[in-house]
């Protein structure tokens, strides 16, 4: 099998196999070919990962931040040097075209390692003067963290979680999605090669039961999950039993509002990126595209023209712009949503069919005349299916954009920047864009509100989610006691 790793797991600095665990076949979504076969972590593997992480963390936390940073920076350099090889593996694992993985996946992971390497030595406490006495604070690592990844950006997510955790003195046990398990193993290898002490970043494979075993272990201080809302609810509840720190980056049904003074080509380009990039499998996608009535038909006509020109096919072809969905199960789910949109009265503008057999392909699909009550406007599809809704006034657009239980992201396109800032200030979303969409630089915090999650990935804000504050009162004079 062309992508078979040395072992299913990576624990305490080396590959680890236990074939008594349930098999995990890894399928290349473009052909249905099995490219690797891994095994779920057994209780013994889980214990080895947690024990080695807990054991290694204290010495790592005691290391000077600049020394930790040096290791992470080396890992970032190694990733960049091997970007082509790693991107090929990412394409095999996810089905995303090389045109994407070469620029968006491991590249962002390398950025995260580099950013947090640079930030780590600058994380300091504060001094609070109290006359003769004073208080100083220390930011301390939380300890042993658990990261749980999603299948859409497996390697990027692994890096986004590992980078702040390790930079700030924590250890991490990471469980990738069982659908895309390969990239995290490469990250673990690279970190060891860069000089990371064994045990600090362990990778274990498995389905929900493995995640539950990790999240509920008494040694775990923090859980960071990227996943669906139902999974997030379960993990959040399990973590709450031990009063653990949590970061939850969950699903979305994000609005993209296009006013009639917007640059039409840019707005259409953003809507396409926010619905068709990675075959629509991005949590922050702007899948509810609100277009002001006066430009709706012009918007739809040009959108259909550009969508029909998207080149689909073999993800290993560097000219291909859109690959398959990640699995047969995801294909069936997306096709069911398309049929429901038809049945509920959506006007099909383009696409709407499975495409490019064999493989899990769906055409870029656009429905117009979608109403807020339709399933397509309420539920996360996670596929290349765009819902276009029309609106008349700014106030209407804001109210309807916020009429959802999700709150991950939102976008506004307009030539009036005063209006743009005014609208963004009222949108209930953790991450917003003005005249852009789905750009997530690691320097900026990313995360949602409402059912889309708690906490933030990336940026300086992530420091608060991987450290805790110790407050130290220093008395400089005699103690004045009343007894």
From Swiss-Prot:
<feature type="active site" description="Charge relay system">
    <location>
        <position position="161"/>
    </location>
</feature>
<comment type="pathway">
    <text>Amine and polyamine biosynthesis; betaine biosynthesis via choline pathway; betaine from betaine aldehyde: step 1/1.</text>
</comment>
<keyword id="KW-0520">NAD</keyword>
<feature type="binding site" description="covalent">
    <location>
        <position position="283"/>
    </location>
    <ligand>
        <name>NAD(+)</name>
    </ligand>
</feature>
<dbReference type="GO" id="GO:0008802">
    <property type="term" value="F:betaine-aldehyde dehydrogenase (NAD+) activity"/>
</dbReference>
<dbReference type="InterPro" id="IPR016160">
    <property type="entry name" value="Ald_DH_CS_CYS"/>
</dbReference>
<feature type="modified residue" description="Cysteine sulfenic acid (-SOH)">
    <location>
        <position position="283"/>
    </location>
</feature>
<dbReference type="Pfam" id="PF00171">
    <property type="entry name" value="Aldedh"/>
</dbReference>
<feature type="binding site">
    <location>
        <position position="27"/>
    </location>
    <ligand>
        <name>K(+) 1</name>
    </ligand>
</feature>
<protein>
    <recommendedName>
        <fullName>Betaine aldehyde dehydrogenase</fullName>
        <ecNumber>1.2.1.8</ecNumber>
    </recommendedName>
</protein>
<feature type="binding site">
    <location>
        <position position="453"/>
    </location>
    <ligand>
        <name>K(+) 2</name>
    </ligand>
</feature>
<dbReference type="GO" id="GO:0019285">
    <property type="term" value="P:glycine betaine biosynthetic process from choline"/>
</dbReference>
<dbReference type="InterPro" id="IPR011264">
    <property type="entry name" value="BADH"/>
</dbReference>
<dbReference type="InterPro" id="IPR016163">
    <property type="entry name" value="Ald_DH_C"/>
</dbReference>
<feature type="binding site">
    <location>
        <begin position="228"/>
        <end position="231"/>
    </location>
    <ligand>
        <name>NAD(+)</name>
    </ligand>
</feature>
<feature type="active site" description="Proton acceptor">
    <location>
        <position position="249"/>
    </location>
</feature>
<dbReference type="InterPro" id="IPR016161">
    <property type="entry name" value="Ald_DH/histidinol_DH"/>
</dbReference>
<keyword id="KW-0479">Metal-binding</keyword>
<keyword id="KW-0560">Oxidoreductase</keyword>
<feature type="binding site">
    <location>
        <position position="450"/>
    </location>
    <ligand>
        <name>K(+) 2</name>
    </ligand>
</feature>
<dbReference type="InterPro" id="IPR015590">
    <property type="entry name" value="Aldehyde_DH_dom"/>
</dbReference>
<dbReference type="InterPro" id="IPR029510">
    <property type="entry name" value="Ald_DH_CS_GLU"/>
</dbReference>
<feature type="binding site">
    <location>
        <position position="93"/>
    </location>
    <ligand>
        <name>K(+) 1</name>
    </ligand>
</feature>
<feature type="binding site">
    <location>
        <position position="243"/>
    </location>
    <ligand>
        <name>K(+) 2</name>
    </ligand>
</feature>
<comment type="subunit">
    <text>Dimer of dimers.</text>
</comment>
<keyword id="KW-0630">Potassium</keyword>
<feature type="binding site">
    <location>
        <begin position="149"/>
        <end position="151"/>
    </location>
    <ligand>
        <name>NAD(+)</name>
    </ligand>
</feature>
<comment type="similarity">
    <text>Belongs to the aldehyde dehydrogenase family.</text>
</comment>
<feature type="active site" description="Charge relay system">
    <location>
        <position position="457"/>
    </location>
</feature>
<keyword id="KW-0558">Oxidation</keyword>
<dbReference type="GO" id="GO:0046872">
    <property type="term" value="F:metal ion binding"/>
</dbReference>
<feature type="binding site">
    <location>
        <position position="251"/>
    </location>
    <ligand>
        <name>NAD(+)</name>
    </ligand>
</feature>
<feature type="binding site">
    <location>
        <position position="380"/>
    </location>
    <ligand>
        <name>NAD(+)</name>
    </ligand>
</feature>
<comment type="function">
    <text>Involved in the biosynthesis of the osmoprotectant glycine betaine. Catalyzes the irreversible oxidation of betaine aldehyde to the corresponding acid.</text>
</comment>
<keyword id="KW-0521">NADP</keyword>
<feature type="binding site">
    <location>
        <begin position="175"/>
        <end position="178"/>
    </location>
    <ligand>
        <name>NAD(+)</name>
    </ligand>
</feature>
<feature type="binding site">
    <location>
        <position position="179"/>
    </location>
    <ligand>
        <name>K(+) 1</name>
    </ligand>
</feature>
<dbReference type="InterPro" id="IPR016162">
    <property type="entry name" value="Ald_DH_N"/>
</dbReference>
<feature type="active site" description="Nucleophile">
    <location>
        <position position="283"/>
    </location>
</feature>
């Amino acid at each position: 099998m062309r992508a078979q790793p040395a072992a299913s797991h990576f624990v305490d600095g080396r590959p680890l196999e236990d074939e008594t665990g349930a098999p995990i076949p890894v399928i290349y979504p473009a052909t249905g070919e099995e490219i690797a076969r891994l095994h779920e972590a057994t209780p013994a593997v889980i214990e080895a990962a947690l024990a080695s992480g807990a054991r290694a963390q204290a010495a790592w936390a005691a290391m000077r931040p600049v020394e930790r940073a040096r290791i992470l920076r080396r890992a970032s350099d190694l990733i960049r040097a091997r970007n082509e090889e790693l991107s090929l593996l990412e394409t095999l694992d996810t089905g995303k075209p090389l045109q994407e993985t070469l620029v968006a996946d491991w590249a962002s992971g390398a950025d995260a390692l580099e950013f947090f390497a640079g930030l780590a030595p600058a994380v300091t406490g504060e001094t609070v003067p109290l006359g003769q006495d004073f208080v100083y604070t220390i930011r301390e690592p939380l300890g042993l963290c658990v990261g749980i990844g999603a299948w859409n950006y497996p390697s990027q997510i692994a890096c986004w979680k590992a980078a702040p955790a390790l930079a700030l003195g924590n250890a991490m046990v990471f469980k990738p999605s069982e659908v895309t398990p390969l990239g995290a193993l490469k990250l673990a290898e690279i970190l060891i090669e860069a000089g990371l002490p064994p045990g600090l970043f362990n990778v274990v494979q498995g389905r929900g039961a493995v995640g539950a075993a990790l999240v509920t272990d008494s040694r775990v201080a923090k859980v960071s999950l990227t996943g669906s809302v139902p999974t997030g609810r379960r993990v959040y509840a399990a973590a709450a039993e031990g009063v653990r720190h949590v970061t939850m980056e969950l699903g979305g049904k994000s609005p993209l509002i296009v006013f009639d003074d917007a640059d039409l080509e840019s707005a259409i380009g953003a809507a396409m990126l926010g619905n068709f990039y990675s075959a629509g499998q991005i949590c922050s996608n702007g899948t509810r595209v609100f277009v002001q009535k006066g430009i709706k038909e012009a918007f739809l006509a040009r959108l259909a023209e550009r969508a029909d020109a998207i080149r689909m096919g073999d993800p290993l072809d560097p000219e291909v712009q859109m690959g398959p969905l990640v699995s047969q199960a995801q294909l069936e789910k997306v096709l069911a949503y398309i049929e429901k949109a038809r049945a509920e009265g959506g006007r099909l503008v383009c696409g709407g069919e499975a495409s490019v057999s064999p493989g899990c392909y769906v055409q870029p699909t656009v429905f117009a005349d979608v109403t807020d009550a339709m399933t397509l406007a309420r539920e996360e599809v996670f596929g290349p299916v765009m819902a276009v809704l029309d609106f008349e006034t700014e106030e209407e657009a804001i109210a309807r954009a916020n009429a959802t239980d999700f709150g991950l992201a939102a976008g506004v396109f307009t030539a009036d920047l005063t209006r743009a800032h005014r609208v963004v200030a009222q949108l209930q979303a953790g991450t917003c864009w003005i005249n852009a969409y789905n750009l997530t630089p690691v320097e900026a915090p990313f995360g949602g509100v409402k059912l889309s999650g708690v906490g933030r990935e990336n940026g300086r804000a992530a420091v608060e989610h991987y450290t805790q504050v110790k407050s130290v009162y220093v008395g400089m004079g005699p103690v004045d006691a009343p007894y």
